[in-house]
């Protein structure tokens, strides 16, 4: 049976993809057949092959399996906005059954599957359904990515409590340095480590350019999952 994890963040732009790539690299190094999955992505570029999202492409590159883009990212939208807004505008409903069937297909090929969300925990996929609802439906263990910056402690605790309130397992968390470490960085890390009810899997350092392409798997302790 495949190991499956869902990666969420304390907000958008906190480094979910950077952390996801690091986790995929670590799992590959541990000998797993890995697959990254970004079921819904907004903010994509037009290419000769169609719309392509940079986060989904990074997951595709960092998977040990050779996966088609549509397998990694079944729902792709051009505008970088909440999925429920752009899907309604385009008349393309996001179906949880499609998201789930995509996950099942990857589980048949890989023994370690990482699913990356969009935005934060409660990102809406429609007027009545959120990413959190789908993760709860799938009963996926959750890995929380915390962008270490001012305000992150409150955001981390709110998200962790919401995950646990849904009855899900908070399997671990990853710290992502979204800026060069400030003078309170060590104190933020100490507080987060004490207050988040899950193990710290690793800390991705500040990287100014293309962090999702860097060899960051070495910063992850996969044995804690």
Curated annotation (Swiss-Prot):
Its EC number is 6.3.3.3. This is ATP-dependent dethiobiotin synthetase BioD 1. GO terms for molecular function: ATP binding; dethiobiotin synthase activity; magnesium ion binding. Gene3D superfamilies: P-loop containing nucleotide triphosphate hydrolases (3.40.50.300). Keywords: ATP-binding, Biotin biosynthesis, Cytoplasm, Ligase, Magnesium, Metal-binding, Nucleotide-binding. Its main location: cytoplasm. The active site is at residue 38. It comes from Escherichia coli O157:H7. CDD domains: DTBS. Catalyzes a mechanistically unusual reaction, the ATP-dependent insertion of CO2 between the N7 and N8 nitrogen atoms of 7,8-diaminopelargonic acid (DAPA, also called 7,8-diammoniononanoate) to form a ureido ring. HAMAP family: BioD. Disulfide bonds: none annotated. ATP binds at residues 13-18, 55, 116-119, 176-177, 205-207, 212. It catalyses: (7R,8S)-7,8-diammoniononanoate + CO2 + ATP = (4R,5S)-dethiobiotin + ADP + phosphate + 3 H(+). Pfam families: AAA_26. Its cofactor is Mg(2+).
């Amino acid at each position: 049976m495949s190991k499956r994890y869902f990666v969420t963040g304390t907000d958008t732009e906190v480094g979910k993809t950077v952390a996801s790539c690091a986790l995929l690299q670590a799992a590959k190094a541990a000998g797993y057949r890995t697959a990254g999955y970004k079921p819904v992505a907004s903010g994509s570029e037009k290419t000769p092959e169609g719309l392509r999202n940079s986060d989904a492409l990074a997951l595709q590159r960092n998977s040990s399996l050779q996966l088609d883009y549509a397998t990694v990212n079944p729902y792709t939208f051009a505008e970088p906005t909440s999925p429920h807004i752009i899907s309604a505008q385009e008349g393309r409903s996001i179906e949880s059954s499609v998201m789930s069937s995509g996950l099942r297909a990857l589980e048949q090929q890989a023994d370690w599957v990482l699913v990356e969300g969009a935005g934060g925990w409660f990102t809406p996929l429609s007027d009545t359904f959120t990413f959190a609802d789908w993760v709860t439906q799938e009963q996926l263990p959750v890995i929380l990515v915390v962008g270490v910056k001012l305000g992150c402690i409150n955001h981390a605790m709110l998200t962790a409590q919401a995950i646990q309130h849904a009855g899900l397992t908070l399997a671990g968390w990853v710290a992502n340095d979204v800026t060069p470490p400030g003078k309170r960085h060590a104190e933020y890390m100490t507080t987060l480590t004490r207050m988040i009810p899950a193990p710290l899997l690793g800390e991705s350092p500040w990287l100014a350019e293309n962090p999702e392409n860097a060899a960051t798997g070495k910063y992850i302790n996969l044995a804690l999952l």
